[in-house]
């Protein structure tokens, strides 16, 4: 996470939890193989669901020699919701205490693959009490994967390195420095 207030970096850190932990939780709690747990999370899960259909079963086909898997929807959603609440509350507790008071914080951007899950934005908004967004890039003919929240952290780090590199004074070669002594420009 990174916190900017008034254009200044105020806090940053890492909560070493994410979407893969949700899939692991589903596997540990239900015995469903990890590949199927991941698929159930992505296709059937809802982080903000308070489904009244407590016994509704959701299913995912087994691949190869794996059996089909099934789980009650409310159990799946509760596993997802519990882990995401933990993640969001860990981030919130790591931030300065007055971050969300008054008009200091205008919103939260969600990144990573788990941010694409149903209900994640609503759950995050409930925890942080502010508007929730997902980062998007200005369209300039760039490949569509650059707009994908799963890649925004890596792309952001690359972009940050590019900006830092552009701000460094350009170093001239040895020959350019020697010629510079005589008033010639190195081209």
Which residues does each predicted region cover?
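Helical "lid/coupling" subdomains associated with nucleotide-phosphate turnover
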Residues: 2-187
């Amino acid at each position: 996470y990174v916190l900017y207030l008034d254009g200044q970096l105020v806090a940053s850190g890492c909560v070493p939890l994410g979407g893969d932990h949700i899939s692991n939780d589903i596997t540990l709690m239900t015995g469903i193989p990890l590949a199927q747990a991941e698929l159930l999370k992505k296709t059937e899960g809802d982080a903000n669901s308070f489904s009244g259909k407590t016994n509704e079963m959701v299913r995912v086909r087994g691949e190869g020699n794996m059996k089909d898997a099934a789980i009650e929807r409310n159990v799946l959603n509760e596993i997802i919701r519990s882990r995401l609440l933990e993640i969001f509350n860990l981030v919130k507790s790591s931030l300065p205490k007055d971050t969300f008071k008054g008009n200091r914080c205008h919103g939260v951007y969600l990144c990573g693959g788990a941010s694409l899950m149903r209900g994640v934005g609503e759950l995050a908004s409930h925890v942080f009490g502010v508007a929730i967004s997902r980062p998007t890039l200005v369209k300039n003919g760039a490949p569509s994967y650059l707009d994908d929240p799963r890649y925004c952290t890596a792309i952001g780090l690359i972009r940050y390195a590019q900006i830092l590199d552009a701000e460094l004074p350009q170093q001239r070669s040895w020959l350019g420095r020697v010629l510079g002594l005589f008033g010639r420009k190195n081209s």
